[in-house]
C-alpha cells in the first residue's frame, strides 16, 4: 500500500529490505567495513518518497504498538547489553549455545548471539559460508570471519565430503 501511494518503484518486500538495512545501520556498528558499506548503500535521503514511506511505516508501527522482526532483535540486544542483574542472569542460564545455518545470520543477529553467549562455556556455529543465500535479507557470510577474529581459539572442523546430496545433483 505505501509503495503504491508513494509512487515507489519497489515491491513491498524490497521496501522491507531497505527498512531492515536502515534499522541495522542505525543500531549496530559491525566493524568499520560493515558501517562503511551500510553508509555507501543507504537509499534514504530526507524528503524523498522512500524516506517518507519508511517514516510512515515506523509511525504506524509505533501508533499500533507493533514490532517488526528487526525491532524484536534490536530490543533483545538492548536488553542483553544492559549492565544489570537481569541481563547477567539471563545470559548465565545457557552454558552451551548452538547456532545452525550460521551463514544466513545478519550482523545484528551475530551481535545478539555474542551477547547471549558472553557467560557461556561453549558456542557452536554450524554453516557453510559458500552457501549463504539470504544476502537480500541482510545475512552476511562475513560473520564467519568476524567470529574467527573474535574467537581465535575456536576449533574449525571442515567437512570435505558432501553428505546432503550426490554429485549428480
Residue ranges and their predicted role:
Residues 9-24, 47, 51:
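Short, well-structured alpha-helical segments
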